[in-house]
Amino acid sequence: MDFELEPTLESIVEHDSLKWIFVGGKGGVGKTTTSSSIAVQLALSKPNDQFLLISTDPAHNLSDAFCQKFGKDARPVEGLPNLSCMEIDPEAAMSDLQQQASQYNNDPSDPMKNIMNDMTGSIPGIDEALSFMEVLKHIKNQKASDGDSDEKTVAYKTIIFDTAPTGHTLRFLQLPATLEKLLGKFKQLSGKLGPMLNMLGGGQQQDIFEKMNEIQKNVSEVNEQFTNPDLTTFVCVCISEFLSLYETERMIQELVSYNMDVNSIVVNQLLFADNDGSCKRCASRWKMQQKYLDQMAELYEDYHVVKMPLLGTEVRGIDNLKKFSKFLLSPYDPEKDGSLVFDMEEK
């Protein structure tokens, strides 16, 4: 390229049409801090809009990051009312699904009742499926807010996902296309077997088929939105080490194969130890980090590569997140901003 892209996420924060922002990477690289920081900057820059940060990682950390308890329902962040957070709890959601399945009807001989119970049993990838159900719900809310619906729904301008480690995230992003094909086949099958199932199930199956049609439409819309760069983008998070860089490259290749927009990488935990001669370990580690930063500069010359400092304490609480997140928009300068490394409030 003839020019270097800004090493910031300013283009994402200022983007006016983004509906979905995914933040992902290897475990332990700072995904939650990064996703929380992006959400905070979005909320600060657009105070008249509502934003939602969802954790799809079974090991929820949003409550720890904001020092505030979150659950399966969206709750506003204290001190930043136009940002809400929620943590999807797969076990609780599975329990609800099984309860609904057991109450499907009171006829123990109904074959559909057993099918529903089996479907809500031990399903591989249930974390991803439940996360996707949450996406479908918000797609429905978008439609309700765009129309004349009387339902009290909150239409969030942008939804940010604090995702599970790479493997879970990639399975989650495959779901729309996979489900779209599966529902299409199920629709064909239901057309052939519908009359027989209605005889067996007392006519209740018609409701299921109607719901399947509605789900298929919503899934198709999600698939379209996820592959539209004006609506969806993915932010990769890594640290400047070999394994993390390797995982990032693998993830980017996968995302490109899904036709998803990805042009931003956040590199966390950098030491910036050029003038730290008193700490040999810091200097040695910074030298190693610089080696991988140089490799990233070659590999990702057409990406926004954001370099974030390693701090002296954890980034917890809304005040600390506000301080730290500003470096997503204005590059960290160790000469000017070095004091911030030890300036965070202990929580």
Curated annotation (Swiss-Prot):
Its EC number is 3.6.-.-. InterPro entries: Anion-transp_ATPase-like_dom (IPR025723), ATPase_ArsA/GET3 (IPR016300), ATPase_ArsA/GET3_euk (IPR027542), P-loop_NTPase (IPR027417). It is found in: Cytoplasm; Endoplasmic reticulum; Golgi apparatus. Keywords: ATP-binding, Cytoplasm, Endoplasmic reticulum, Golgi apparatus, Hydrolase, Metal-binding, Nucleotide-binding, Transport, Zinc. One of its GO terms (cellular component) is GET complex. ATP binds at residues 26-33, 241, 268. The active site is at residue 57. CDD domains: ArsA. Zn(2+) binds at residues 279, 282. The keyword Cell membrane does not apply. GO terms for biological process: tail-anchored membrane protein insertion into ER membrane. GO terms for molecular function: ATP binding; ATP hydrolysis activity; metal ion binding. It holds the Pfam family ArsA_ATPase. Transmembrane segments: none annotated. HAMAP family: Asna1_Get3 (MF_03112). Homodimer. Component of the Golgi to ER traffic (GET) complex, which is composed of GET1, GET2 and GET3. Within the complex, GET1 and GET2 form a heterotetramer which is stabilized by phosphatidylinositol binding and which binds to the GET3 homodimer. Interacts with the chloride channel protein GEF1. Belongs to the arsA ATPase family. ATPase required for the post-translational delivery of tail-anchored (TA) proteins to the endoplasmic reticulum. Recognizes and selectively binds the transmembrane domain of TA proteins in the cytosol. This complex then targets to the endoplasmic reticulum by membrane-bound receptors GET1 and GET2, where the tail-anchored protein is released for insertion. This process is regulated by ATP binding and hydrolysis. ATP binding drives the homodimer towards the closed dimer state, facilitating recognition of newly synthesized TA membrane proteins. ATP hydrolysis is required for insertion. NCBIfam families: GET3_arsA_TRC40. This is ATPase GET3. It comes from Meyerozyma guilliermondii (strain ATCC 6260 / CBS 566 / DSM 6381 / JCM 1539 / NBRC 10279 / NRRL Y-324) (Yeast). The gene is GET3.
